Amino acid sequence: MSQPITRENFDEWMIPVYAPAPFIPVRGEGSRLWDQQGKEYIDFAGGIAVNALGHAHPELREALNEQASKFWHTGNGYTNEPVLRLAKKLIDATFADRVFFCNSGAEANEAALKLARKFAHDRYGSHKSGIVAFKNAFHGRTLFTVSAGGQPAYSQDFAPLPPDIRHAAYNDINSASALIDDATCAVIVEPIQGEGGVVPASNAFLQGLRELCDRHNALLIFDEVQTGVGRTGELYACMHYGVTPDLLTTAKALGGGFPVGALLATEECASVMTVGTHGTTYGGNPLASAVAGKVLDLINTPEMLNGVKQRHDWFVERLNSINHHYSLFSEVRGLGLLIGCVLNADYAGQAKQISQEAVKAGVMVLIAGGNVVRFAPALNVSEEEVTTGLDRFAAACEHFVSRGSS
């Protein structure tokens, strides 16, 4: 018989790039999880905006099991029916004419940046290689994407970094305009900065970026890894703004918990990519594609997307009520079910401590830096789960405040 697994085993065996919670989840259903001891948690973290339909959704399980009984993998020397169906669904639902599949958001962003460089090289010459990104952004952990993310803490120990990447201030079109010129090949931006604090872009900012890119023949890349697939109440957040990118990256919720990512592109952009210019062994595998296809079927409906907007109101109303009692937050912001509670000056830097109190109370939340408590629950979270989870969060806030004043 094998030895029981404990949380301490993580500290013994794993490369220490994470600091996971003190419990190990073993079972989930809907927006509830249970740990090894049987304690129940309401999940408002959603696997960092991944579990868009909660845990163990029956239709996702059915799609996975059905494909698993056929075949799992062939490699990119062959295509398969699930990936072609998935590609058509994404094309029909968005601006895109072509799709490249991969396994994560970082890979999707890596592909987008490589495509942008190649597009500019082929059309305009090697001088046009500049990339403009934004401070406090997050685009992934590859060397290219971590360099595009404007957070030195994630990149400072890995020099030399890829060159020709500059960072403007987010939501500041004048700052961006000062950096975007005829040597710029692409601008990459999140419609809502997730890891950077749940900061929505303004309409004027995204529209201004579109105009600047058009003026300087640069590609506009929307990183919708966290905001995509219904998270904001539209299939993709850019649909709130009426701004169409040249490239869009998507992952996280696309697989509902199964690893998958995709780069969406116009025909013109995709035309510079030829056999061998990019690839991945597992991208577009039939298991991931079957699940993602079902995810899109379930999420891309008026009922589901309108339900996200309704659930946003449930959360914001109750979070404001909690804040009225405990005066923790200066602002509750976000779109749909990507919500950030910004700590006021009295509690600055203590988001992690609040998230730890929440776990003790039986509710899982995220942070976005030291000053923002982040919520990214399942898009189909029930009213009862919202009520129960926020009751527990209120208890955590009460304990946090009373502990600090004792």
Swiss-Prot record:
Domain of life according to the entry: Bacteria
Coiled coil: none
Reactions catalysed: N(2)-succinyl-L-ornithine + 2-oxoglutarate = N-succinyl-L-glutamate 5-semialdehyde + L-glutamate
Residues where N6-(pyridoxal phosphate)lysine is found: 252
Keyword Cell cycle in record: no
Pathway assignment: Amino-acid degradation; L-arginine degradation via AST pathway; L-glutamate and succinate from L-arginine: step 3/5
EC numbers: 2.6.1.81
Keywords: Aminotransferase, Arginine metabolism, Pyridoxal phosphate, Transferase
GO biological process, one term: alpha-amino acid biosynthetic process
CDD domains (alphabetical): OAT_like
Matching InterPro entries: Ac/SucOrn_transaminase_bac (IPR017652), AcOrn/SuccOrn_fam (IPR004636), Aminotrans_3 (IPR005814), Aminotrans_3_PPA_site (IPR049704), Class-III_PLP-dep_AT (IPR050103), PyrdxlP-dep_Trfase (IPR015424), PyrdxlP-dep_Trfase_major (IPR015421), PyrdxlP-dep_Trfase_small (IPR015422)
GO molecular function ontology, one term from the record: identical protein binding
Cofactor(s) in the UniProt record: pyridoxal 5'-phosphate
Known function: Catalyzes the transamination of N(2)-succinylornithine and alpha-ketoglutarate into N(2)-succinylglutamate semialdehyde and glutamate. Can also act as an acetylornithine aminotransferase.
The family this protein is said to belong to: Belongs to the class-III pyridoxal-phosphate-dependent aminotransferase family. AstC subfamily.
Protein name: Succinylornithine transaminase
Lineage of origin: Bacteria, Pseudomonadati, Pseudomonadota, Gammaproteobacteria, Enterobacterales
